[in-house]
Amino acid sequence: MAKQIQAIRGMNDILPTQSPLWQKMEAVLRSSVSAYGYSEIRTPIVENTDLFKRSIGEVTDIVEKEMYTFADNNGDSLTLRPEGTASTVRAGNENGLLYNQEQRLWYMGPMFRHERPQKGRYRQFNQFGVEVYGIGTADIDAEVLMLSARLWEKLGISDHVSLELNTLGDPAERAVYRDALIAFLEQHKDALDEDSKRRMYSNPLRVLDSKDQNVQAILAGAPELMDFLGEESKTHFSQLRELLDAVGIKYTINPRLVRGLDYYNRTVFEWVTSSLGSQGTVLAGGRYDGLVAQLGGKDTPAVGFAMGLERIVLLLETLELNKDIPSEVDVYVTAMGDSCLVEAIKIAQELRSALPNLKVMSHCGGGNVKKQMKRADKSGASVALLIGEDELAEGMVTVKHLRNDIEQQRVARSALGAFLAELAIK
């Protein structure tokens, strides 16, 4: 027997038993962004490597360690996209969507990062994101947070997530703070772990995000960015908090929250959960006013967020919110003998036309009644339709209920659609 080929480590299949939960989640995401008037954008999976070096930052973990990068036949350096924001900005600049315009966009699709696979974190993962361009005021920051809160409400997990909020100020304020933070870290250099020592000069704000407990103890005495903000940044953050308070969105200010990408400024946020252990962040984002110009466009304010969908699915499963997913099949149509096969197939087609929301599966492959009933039960259908010679002769169909104790019934073929609609099969 030939050796089986396995999936690449960290790149997982979504199997038929899992896909209904994904479909339900994706439907919630689509309906929620639609309610806010956002438009979908779809970008290529492969981009020029420079796009991510210029946007994410050359000294970030993503660019240094995690990107899937290769040379094509022309010698160009290409990369499988590790996140969605940079591609959205590139598409907006290239197609004239962002020049003196407001855009509210959303996207959903696979991303790729070569990191250590673990529960809720994979090398190919699906990301959903929202991006807004052309609005620089705090009210749009509040809107994207309101939208994110709506997602949790619609998914039924509002009680299991909490919002953490911070501001990074503008680039000039952050530069002054950066110098102060480096000076502080230099005083404690010998006590820092190797990762923090490496980041201390190249990306010192990322030290604030260290998972090392000893480093966090040292950082308790570090200067706080809030003390380095100018009036404009303080006002923006104050207005955002006021709007969130007005609509009842609770939050905690986390002065250590920085985000892992270089392009953020002012507002940054994360929704976190305690239900997934160490992988607690389920959605993250913020404002990135300089990125559009950094990638060749005009100065354009921007704000957005992204969420890894595998982690949301894991949270739904952990909270056992995947139990009420409807079956992929409502009605299973059987033919009691070869002479009935043609009419059974015709009946199935008639039902699909008359009741387009009804999920109808026809039995194929022959077999006796016992085999067909076994297949019907395994399909998850609520009812099976038995079509034999007696039924055809009388213009009837036998309806067998598979999920309750109702006795089987004979229904006129002409009334079958109305009968099944009245059953309100879900």
Curated annotation (Swiss-Prot):
Catalysed reactions, as listed in the record: tRNA(His) + L-histidine + ATP = L-histidyl-tRNA(His) + AMP + diphosphate + H(+)
Annotated transmembrane regions: none
InterPro entries per the UniProt record, alphabetical: aa-tRNA-synth_II (IPR006195), aa-tRNA-synth_II/BPL/LPL (IPR045864), Anticodon-bd (IPR004154), Anticodon-bd_dom_sf (IPR036621), His-tRNA-ligase (IPR015807), HisRS-like_core (IPR041715), HisRS/HisZ (IPR004516), HisRS_anticodon (IPR033656)
Record-level Gene Ontology MF annotations: ATP binding; histidine-tRNA ligase activity
BP GO terms, sorted: histidyl-tRNA aminoacylation
One Pfam family in the UniProt entry: tRNA-synt_His
Gene Ontology annotations for the cellular component aspect, listed alphabetically: cytoplasm
Record flagged with keyword Ion transport: no
Location of this chain's protein in the cell: Cytoplasm
Tree of life domain: Bacteria
The enzyme's E.C. designation: 6.1.1.21
HAMAP family: His_tRNA_synth
Entry similarity comment: Belongs to the class-II aminoacyl-tRNA synthetase family.
Stated name of the protein: Histidine--tRNA ligase
